Amino acid sequence: MAGWSCLVTGAGGFLGQRIVRLLVEEKEVQEIRALDKVFRPELREEFSKLQSKVKLTVLEGDILDEQFLKRACQGASAVIHTASIIDVTNLFNPQVTMNVNVEGTQLLLEACSQASVPIFIYTSSVAVAGPNSYREIIQNGHEEAHLETKWSSPYPYSKKLAEKAVLAANGLPLKNGGTLYTCALRPMFIYGEGSPTLYYLMHEGLNNNGILTHNCKFSRANPVYVGNIAWAHIMALRALRDPKKAPSIQGQFYYISDDTPPQSYDDLTYTLSKKWGFCLDSRMRLPIFLKYWLAFLLEIVSFLLSPIYKYRPPFDRHLVTWQNSVFTFSYKKAQRDMGYEPLFSWEEAKKRTTEWIDALVEPHQEALKTKTL
């Protein structure tokens, strides 16, 4: 399939832009279409420089705009759908999250059907699998266990519904008589340079005398570096374009991790930032079970006030569970079916992320030294 093209939604985001950079290096790619609601000027400039390697078309528009999606998909050979509202703290209006994550995915699938795009790769989330209880322990989980979140919180629920829609669409007929083939990737918590979460935590730490929040002491996860999850999308695309590998991939979901050591989310943040004197908050915290039931009470208050006031609790039971669970997964199935191997080692991922944090923190170096003395 010489001269193929690929549409990447969410291409202005943390993960999407990394996928675009890798796609540029793929053989025989004729065009990359980068779609997002808005692109930062510096990213637009970077993408324009990539034009020397391949045709790169920037498309600004709404994932809920049906006509826009149909135009974006016209003539494309594959779609990588990363566009999503990622919101575990419920900052967004729940209906907006559901609309973007579920309806947006359904509209894009329909656009692929009408434009006869044969390959659709969806960026799902480990959140679609749980954890459902902070007492639940999943270590080296795998796809055959068919774990599924029971939470109705907008983010995990919307991602679950969207993934189901994508996998159910596998095998559907296209307008030109062809067939749509789909798969979904479930990344762990994604870290790396440009991470919105790390950016927020670093600035919060700078404003808090070099002290990092310590909410996830009892968690154990295996975070994945952004360069490796981006690479997994490339491997999935190659596999779905390969007649020998494609039958094993079609309609499947895959957990994507790498060789980052299992650790708590707090420990990861500390490891990446400790050279600047950041430290974890040592103050006593509420026991998990008390925080869980406090979250339940806050959810009840939010529900009771909803007719007259939109109160959004600072945390809910899903977030408390997420922050305090043992929940790790293996990437062996992706390794077996699509040949995925992490492109970056833990040491390289740590080095790259730390250098990015250095650039964030360095302008505040003197103030940070004073605060941490």
From Swiss-Prot:
Gene3D superfamilies linked: NAD(P)-binding Rossmann-like Domain
UniProt topology in membrane: Single-pass membrane protein
Enzyme Commission no: 1.1.1.145, 5.3.3.1
Cysteine disulfide partners in this protein: none
Pathway(s) the chain acts in: Lipid metabolism; steroid biosynthesis
Subcellular localization: Endoplasmic reticulum membrane; Mitochondrion membrane
Transmembrane segments: 288-308
Active site (record annotation): 155
Main localization (coarse): endoplasmic reticulum
Gene Ontology terms for molecular function: 3-beta-hydroxy-Delta5-steroid dehydrogenase (NAD+) activity; oxidoreductase activity, acting on the CH-OH group of donors, NAD or NADP as acceptor; steroid Delta-isomerase activity
Positions of NAD(+) binding: 159
Keywords for the protein's UniProt record, in alphabetical order: Endoplasmic reticulum, Isomerase, Membrane, Mitochondrion, Multifunctional enzyme, NAD, Oxidoreductase, Steroidogenesis, Transmembrane, Transmembrane helix
A GO biological process held by the record: steroid biosynthetic process
Role, per record: 3-beta-HSD is a bifunctional enzyme, that catalyzes the oxidative conversion of Delta(5)-ene-3-beta-hydroxy steroid, and the oxidative conversion of ketosteroids. The 3-beta-HSD enzymatic system plays a crucial role in the biosynthesis of all classes of hormonal steroids.
Protein name, per record: 3 beta-hydroxysteroid dehydrogenase/Delta 5-->4-isomerase
Gene: HSD3B
